Structures are given as structure tokens and as C-alpha cells.
From Swiss-Prot:
Keywords: Chaperone, Cytoplasm, Protein transport, Translocation, Transport. It is found in: Cytoplasm. InterPro entries: SecB (IPR003708), SecB-like_sf (IPR035958). Belongs to the SecB family. One of its GO terms (molecular function) is unfolded protein binding. This is Protein-export protein SecB. It comes from Bradyrhizobium sp. (strain BTAi1 / ATCC BAA-1182).
Length: 162
């Protein structure tokens, strides 16, 4: 059967995404004011979280994707704890059209990595003497769009004459 232009739609193999490896690339937890920071506080600490995603090619169809999660909990001017996790994965993407490669690497792959990174953060904070920090789910589509808008704005700023 053809699709009207003579091409056989069944001839194109479906896209494939395989997870080849997952690993902690970097993990840091700091509890700079222990043991005083472990005492009950009047107010819950303010917790700020930053999440970034990166990807780089290892081979034609293999890519490393990194999910970086940084956080800091502060009570007033005192740092209760801070952490940084860079969690990586190696993915094989086969038969993925070029225009879908970036969204696959920066949306779908981090979505697969996030539950494991979330558990590592929760356990690290708990092992540091605090209640486990359960990160909220991340909308990687919105994060991807924000990053694309920032890149477009930065390129626009570079193109403008002075």
C-alpha cells in the first residue's frame, strides 16, 4: 500500500529510544551548620531548587543526557543544607528524525531520569539529618520551551548591530 506519493509508509522503521546506562556523575551535600541546623526551627526553611538539562553526542546514535538539580534550604540567613546532583544517562536514539532529536534528548530522556534523581535527592537530604526532600514533578516541556526562548533571545541580541 502507498500513501499517495508512491512511498510505502510501512517501510520507515519506528523511532527507538533505549536507556544504555544511568549513573551519578556528581553528588554533593553540605550541612554547614550541623549540629545546630538539625534542631527544630520555628519556621520551615525556604528551599530553592534549580533544574537544568544538558545533552551531548557520544556517537552517531548514542547521547549522554545530564539532569542537574541544585538546591539550598535557608532559615533566615542561615543555610540549613545545600546539595547538587548531576545525574546522567546514556541513551541510544535510532530512526529519530533530526527535528525530533532535540525534544527527545531534552524532554523525554530527562523525564526517564527524573524519578531516579528525585530518589537520590530525597535520600541524601534524609541522610543529612533532615526530612526527605520530595521534589515536585518537573514539566520538562515547559523547561525546554523556556530554554529555547532564552537561546533565541540570546541569538537575537548577538545579531543586532551596536
Amino acid at each position: 500500500m502507498t500513501n499517495g506519493n508512491g512511498a510505502n509508509p510501512e517501510a520507515a522503521p519506528p523511532p527507538q529510544l533505549n536507556v544504555l546506562a544511568q549513573y551519578i556523575k556528581d553528588l554533593s551535600f553540605e550541612n554547614p551548620n550541623a549540629p545546630q541546623s538539625l534542631a527544630p526551627q520555628g519556621q520551615p526553611p525556604q528551599i530553592n531548587i534549580q533544574i537544568n538539562v544538558g545533552a551531548n553526542a557520544l556517537a552517531d546514535t548514542e547521547f549522554e543526557v545530564t539532569l542537574t538539580i541544585e538546591g539550598k534550604a535557608e532559615s533566615g540567613t542561615q543555610v540549613m543544607f545545600s546539595f547538587e546532583l548531576v545525574y546522567g544517562g546514556v541513551f541510544r536514539l535510532v530512526n529519530v528524525p533530526q527535528e525530533h532529536l532535540s525534544p527527545m534528548l531534552l524532554i523525554e530522556c530527562p523525564r526517564l531520569l527524573f524519578p531516579f534523581a528525585r530518589e537520590i535527592v530525597a535520600n541524601s537530604v534524609r541522610d543529612g539529618g533532615f526530612p526527605p526532600l520530595m521534589l515536585d514533578p518537573v514539566d520538562f516541556v515547559s523547561l525546554y520551551r523556556q530554554n529555547m526562548e532564552r537561546q533565541a533571545a540570546a541569538q537575537g541580541a548577538q545579531i543586532r548591530p551596536s
